[in-house]
Swiss-Prot record:
Alphabetized InterPro entries for the sequence: WD40/YVTN_repeat-like_dom_sf, WD40_repeat_dom_sf, WDR55_POC1
Annotated spans, Disordered: 39-65, 352-414
Entry GO terms, CC: nucleolus
Subcellular locations according to the entry: Nucleus, Nucleolus
WD repeats by residue range: 9-48, 73-112, 118-159, 222-263, 319-356
Protein name: WD repeat-containing protein jip5
Biased composition (Acidic residues): 369-383
Classification of source organism: Eukaryota, Fungi, Dikarya, Ascomycota, Pezizomycotina
């Protein structure tokens, strides 16, 4: 189904990953507090220095990945990243208690927000940052707080306070998925979103606050994603939120029926409990694969679940020792997976013989990411946190041992 086109090594453990909504750009946040932004090569025909055209340079392994900028953005780890809805701004949040808004193209910081401290006065470390619209930024923290900020208010010590704060869960918020705007929406932006935290799912409204919280699911809910266009039948409208659990099970929730799940899909069965489903992404319809979810596992694999059939139909391996932290599809339909100290870019497999599940997925590249050119306006001192101290509460399971892998990558990588 997918095969790696390149492997991009990082200088430290990946804690967060974000894909630009309009351009082939990926940003990463690291355990050291660094934020780095890369431009991926285009799948479309391009022209070399002699004026000759080369088709799909990223497929033949000769494209360039350009480092647009790199800086030590936070004095602790960079826990979360998110682009604005138009891609102009990149929001990052770190364990230093700050949210920073920077120009996506240059990395220059234009705004800062101090995260409200925990009740004991300590830093309330962030877990999610999400731009809901050009006006609203959502920020979730370890203490289970969900802060809403009005981005139209210029920064000042006073205006840095959130406009609203909710507590939809008793535990920290592990995922946030916006619901599509209603047919009567005049703005075209979402005003409701689903969150998971601890063992519950909740729905929050921009104006009315927390609307509903589910029954206790008796397992930790880790990740979530919305998928529409499914087959409608009976009371089902063909719109669901898919939730990944800590024991290898996907649960399906009918939009509007939030009290309890209505279907279960076993993604990874193991004795004593399955592997945690760390991150989810909808496979773009343009790829012609039907309605499908990509699932990033704590064991380092990525499994593909076909909706309707409700079963795993294919699998690739991101890494054999590190879990998948980031997973998504760029504007050209390439899958981007991140975890450990590597980001991988995948394209649709060429000359597939139908044995997608048997494809080798972990292709390595010589060299390592340079740490010599830290650009930007932030501090670049040598403060480094251990992964154990800075990682969110949930531990990643690891498989022992590592198999041999082929070598493939882009030339002239920065």
């Amino acid at each position: 189904m997918f095969d790696t086109v390149c492997t991009l090594p990082l200088s430290a453990d990946l804690f967060s990953q974000a894909l630009h909504p309009k351009e082939p750009i990926v940003s990463v946040g690291l355990s050291t507090g660094h934020v780095q932004t890369f431009r991926l090569p285009s799948e479309e025909s391009d022209t070399d220095g002699d004026g000759a055209e080369s088709t799909s340079s990223s497929r033949n392994g000769k494209g360039h990945i350009d480092t647009m900028w790199r800086t030590r953005r936070h004095k602790g780890s960079c826990r979360c990243l998110g682009f604005g809805v138009d891609g102009e701004m990149l929001y990052s949040a770190g364990t230093d208690g700050l949210v920073k808004a920077a120009k996506a193209e240059t990395g220059v910081v234009e705004n800062k927000i101090a995260i409200p401290p925990a009740k004991d006065g300590s830093v309330d470390a962030p877990t999610i940052v999400h731009a809901l619209s050009p006006q609203t930024l959502l920020l979730a923290t370890d203490s289970s707080a969900l802060h809403l900020y009005d981005l139209r208010i210029p920064f000042s010590p006073v205006s840095a306070r959130p406009q609203q704060t909710h507590h939809p869960h008793d535990d920290y918020i592990s995922s946030l998925t916006p619901l599509p705007p209603s047919d009567t929406s005049t703005s075209g932006f979402s005003k409701q979103w689903v969150t998971t935290g601890g063992t519950t799912l909740a729905v929050t409204d921009l104006r009315r606050g927390v609307l509903v919280r589910s029954e206790d699911q008796e397992e930790e809910l880790v990740s979530s994603v919305y998928i529409g266009g499914l087959r409608a039948s009976g009371t089902s409208r063909g719109e669901k939120v898919v939730v990944g659990g800590s024991s290898g099970v996907l649960t399906l929730w009918e939009k509007g029926a939030w009290d309890d799940q209505d279907e279960r899909i076993y993604v990874q069965r193991e004795a004593g409990g399955g592997e945690s489903l760390e991150t989810l992404a909808v496979v773009p319809d343009e790829l012609g694969k039907g309605k499908m979810i990509a699932v990033g596992l704590g064991s380092g694999g990525v499994k593909f679940v076909r909706m309707g059939m409700n079963k795993v139909v294919s699998e690739v391996m991101h890494d054999e020792t590190e879990g998948v932290i980031g997973l998504g599809f760029d504007v050209e339909g390439r899958m981007v997976s991140g975890g450990g100290q590597v980001v991988k870019v995948w394209h649709e497999a060429v000359d597939s013989d139908g044995m997608d599940g048997d494809m080798a997925g972990g292709k390595r590249m010589f060299g390592s990411d340079s740490d010599d050119s830290d650009d930007g306006d932030d501090s670049d001192d040598s403060d480094r946190e251990s992964r154990k101290a800075a990682q969110p509460q949930r531990k990643k399971k690891k498989n022992k041992g590592k198999g041999g892998q082929d070598i493939m990558g882009f030339a002239d990588i920065d």
